[in-house]
Amino acid sequence: MAATLAKVKAVKPDVLVVSGHTKGALTAVRQIAEMKVDVPMLAMTHCDAAKLSKQHGKNSQYALCASQWHKTLTYKDDFFKDGMTYDADFTKEFGYAPPYQAAESSAALLVFKDAFERANSFDKVKVRDALADTNMQTFYGNIKFAEGGQNVDKPMVLFQVMCDGDKCENKVVAPTKWAS
């Protein structure tokens, strides 16, 4: 990463996009700070998994991060209620905040429950057809499948690491409907 960041420092781009896994995100933020690389915008992947705001605090401030879910989104359902309730319940049960993978897995169970109920059967064709006809909202987001099986009704979330003193948090900045 150091060689790439040396080039970034010399070229002075307007945006640096870092995509990789957890270790790569942590390494990038650490080395950007150590090497005093100044870019107007840093966009990254894997910020949630890397716990970027907690691991690197102010060094990660203003990093823009794509994610599948954030607890502050206002989607609702009858089982988990909303993201904040899900977050509190999950944290109480497991001792840590839920990553988006836990949230999407919980939402998937709601989708299957709904499909089984609508199919009123365990017949695989009836269940498959019920899944294909899914159009519902969960605490995780809207669920509606395209012909190819993709959920086409839930946007990605973009958050930015924001710090107030030494406390750094992920704040949703897009979609603007949920910007904090």
Task: Explain the meaning of each model-derived region.
Residues 1-180:
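Extracytosolic ligand-binding ectodomains
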